[in-house]
Amino acid sequence: EEKLKTALKVNAPEYFPVERRDDRFKLLQATCALPFLFPVFDIQGKPCMDGGAADAIPHDRALERGCERVIVVLTRERSYVRRPEKLQPLIDAAYRKYPRFCDTMRRRADAYNTSRERLFQLEREGRALLFAPHSTEGFHRTEKDVEKIRALWKDGYDEGMERLDEVQAFLSGS
């Protein structure tokens, strides 16, 4: 099992094995440390933050490691297209010690959209099975409303149950 994080100085995603002895869950915290909301984490001497900054949909890693097919759960609708970061000037100021991270954030929308198109191509080829919410309208990545979270979870759960035969066929290669 691996966790993805963004190494701020090298402008790249990095994957780390999950150590069972990490009693403070430092690596896990770093993998979801959103800019501005969390501090920069030091992992093995490297400043790190949210893995999604460098690799928002990390399906290529599975393919590079020998998987022939992937199941991907998207957190946004299939139609979602990421726009350039409105807060880029703030990112540049807040993370000026990490210019490569700022570059990553500047290119994040293009990288996400390219990754998304690649996933759709893999899906057409029968090499990817995608799940995506029907709607995330009114839902924010820092959502605290338990009912909204529960409703979005239930939507995903229901779709998973409805598509169970499709998942089993995909996994068996038929």
Question: What are these regions, as identified by a protein language model?
Answer:
Residues 1-174:
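Patatin-like phospholipase
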